[in-house]
């Protein structure tokens, strides 16, 4: 197993310092620190550009874009790429849609084994796996499906797994201001399987711990034990 760990917060850091540090971390999904601006009116224009690019790629590998089997390939690839990167067209505010509730709950909430698929930004090849996401509420909870949707939103972009893990943790921190957030992601990368080192069966594991999960060993251990526990209702 290949293991990588991404811990952005130092031990003992309080919540105020935590928020300041999170906001200062670099994010290559922004342009000069500004959010990516999406222009829905350009969808068809961008699709045509991608189709032209696919035709060039086909010609560059010695194929004929006009042969029967490839006639619709540029359109299919462009539409697939628009689907696989639709996370750029989503915002955290619209995704959550006010589904935050005052419950007074202060014990761990964990959604585990969330399937995700993303594209490596280096080779634009898929990586996929499972995400485990937990938080300890500070009187507020969010609809469980929203946690899975947050994973989906950030996965549907060009990514590296380390940044993806951190972005998910930061998003939950932003919407709930909980006592702590923990994210572990396990994935296999096609750029390591299909090309390059060509190592099928290798997995990359990344983690991001915020607040009590970073500062309290028992809390962190409880989370790690829970994601290893096999449910008995299957």
Swiss-Prot record:
Q: State the signal peptide span.
A: none
Q: Provide the alphabetized UniProt keywords.
A: GTP-binding, Hydrolase, Metal-binding, Nucleotide-binding, One-carbon metabolism, Zinc
Q: One GO BP annotation here?
A: tetrahydrobiopterin biosynthetic process
What does the subunit section of this Swiss-Prot or TrEMBL entry state?
Toroid-shaped homodecamer, composed of two pentamers of five dimers.
Q: What class of enzyme is it?
A: hydrolase
The cross-references to InterPro entries, in alphabetical order and at most eight, read: GTP-CH-I_C/QueF (IPR043133), GTP-CH-I_N (IPR043134), GTP_CycHdrlase_I (IPR001474), GTP_CycHdrlase_I_CS (IPR018234), GTP_CycHdrlase_I_dom (IPR020602)
Q: Which gene encodes it?
A: folE
Report if keyword Nucleotide-binding is assigned: yes
> Belongs to which family?
Belongs to the GTP cyclohydrolase I family.
Q: Which superkingdom is the protein from?
A: Bacteria
In short, the EC number is: 3.5.4.16
Protein transport in keyword set: no
Supply the name of the protein: GTP cyclohydrolase 1
Please provide one cellular component term from the Gene Ontology annotations of this protein. Answer: cytoplasm
- Which annotated residues bind Zn(2+)? 120, 123, 191
Gene Ontology molecular functions: GTP binding; GTP cyclohydrolase I activity; zinc ion binding
């Amino acid at each position: 197993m290949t293991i990588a760990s991404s811990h952005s917060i130092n031990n003992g850091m309080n919540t105020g310092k935590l928020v300041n540090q999170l906001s200062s971390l670099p994010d290559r999904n922004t342009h000069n620190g500004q959010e990516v601006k999406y222009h829905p009116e350009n969808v068809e224009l961008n699709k045509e550009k991608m189709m032209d690019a696919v035709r060039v790629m086909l010609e560059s590998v010695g194929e004929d874009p006009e042969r029967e089997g490839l006639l619709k390939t540029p359109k299919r690839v462009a539409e697939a790429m628009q689907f696989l990167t639709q996370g750029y067209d989503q915002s955290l505010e619209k995704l959550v849609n006010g589904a935050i509730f005052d419950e007074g709950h202060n014990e761990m909430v964990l959604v585990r084994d969330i399937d995700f698929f993303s594209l490596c930004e280096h080779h634009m090849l898929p990586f996929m796996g499972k995400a485990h996401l937990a938080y300890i509420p500070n009187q507020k909870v969010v609809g469980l499906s929203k946690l899975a949707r947050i994973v989906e939103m950030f996965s549907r972009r060009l990514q590296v797994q380390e940044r993806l893990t951190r972005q998910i943790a930061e998003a939950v921190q932003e919407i709930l201001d909980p006592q702590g957030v923990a994210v572990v992601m396990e994935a296999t990368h096609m750029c390591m399987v299909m090309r390059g080192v060509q190592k099928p069966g290798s997995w990359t594991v990344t983690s991001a711990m915020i607040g009590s999960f970073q500062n309290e060993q028992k809390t962190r251990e409880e989370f790690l034990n829970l994601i290893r526990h096999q449910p008995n209702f299957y």
